[in-house]
Amino acid sequence: MDEIRIPNDATYAPFSLTDVIATAPIASRLLLGATLPGRILSAAALGLYAGSAAKDWLSRLDMRWIDFSREFGCDVKTLQEMPDPARRDEVERIASRLDECFTDERIPRHELAASVNHHLTEYMAAITGQRVHTSSEIRDFTLAKLIFPFATGVCDVVSGDVALFRDSGIFEPHIICHEFVHRKGYWKELHAQALSYLALMSSGDPVLVQAALAERLHRQLKVLAGDDDQAYHDLVDGLKMREALAQELHALRPEAGMQESSVSVIMKKLYDERLKLTGQNGLSDYDVGFTNFLWTFTQSGNARQEARQAAF
């Protein structure tokens, strides 16, 4: 099997290079009373950032990209709407499966990242016949947390830098895998959601499979509840899952009546528009698009991949 290595040099730097580029002149002015040292440091970081991005781009020239329409029978703009009764039935079945197979095992983040990256690489290789090796490095903080306060994790698709901003409990393997799909070069959110889910489900690892199913359940609940926070919490309570699982699901949505910060609301709207301008459906691709993708995949008669991958 062909092997390709994306260097991802920027991910091994002790600090996010984009953070250094943005803040070095300001920090230099505040600490030293002069901006020149900061500008020199910023320029050096920019050079490293550009060099890393160029090396990654050159490595990707030989990549075999997954054709989603061919492999799964659908793509961002060709999704079938999943019927509401089918959604509700799926919610009940996933909740039951999660309850029966629950594991409270927690894997240290650096080990989890390596495991997730391995299974993602192998899953994609089974489709393309090519292993694309990438970094497993993850940061705990970047300035993106201030810009996107609603996000649990981010990936700079230019440098491949990934950061997770908080402990995400049972969902963490999926969040890591989602960002690692971006690191491999797939920048559309629907593609990241789908490949992450399918890779984790194929792993056979109870912790990773649980994360995939929990993400699928969470997204179905979001679709059914819409913008109604109380409806979401009522749906979770109605499933009568074990307390540990219910708490994880409740924690993803604010209590009814609580207001998001104005920064979060504004940035969500801007990010939604940015996604639409790049040929995506917007933030809805995280939940409506993702669940519709799995539904369309199972209903497609011309997908190269076996539809049982989307079953559970």
Regions found by a protein language model. Name each.
Residues 223-251:
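Amphipathic alpha-helical blocks and their helix-capping loop/short-beta junctions
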Residues 172-186, 190-193, 197:
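Active-site recognition of the HExxH zinc-binding catalytic motif
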Residues 1-86, 311-312:
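N-terminal low-structure segments adjacent to metalloprotease catalytic domains
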Residues 102, 124, 128, 184, ...:
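Sec/Tat-exported extracytoplasmic proteins
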Residues 196-233:
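Short helix/loop segments within enzyme catalytic domains
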Residues 99-160, 165, 169:
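Auxiliary, metal-adjacent structural segments of Zn-dependent hydrolase domains
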Residues 245-312:
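Pan-zinc metallopeptidase signature
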Residues 63-115:
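Membrane-interface segments at or immediately adjacent to transmembrane helices
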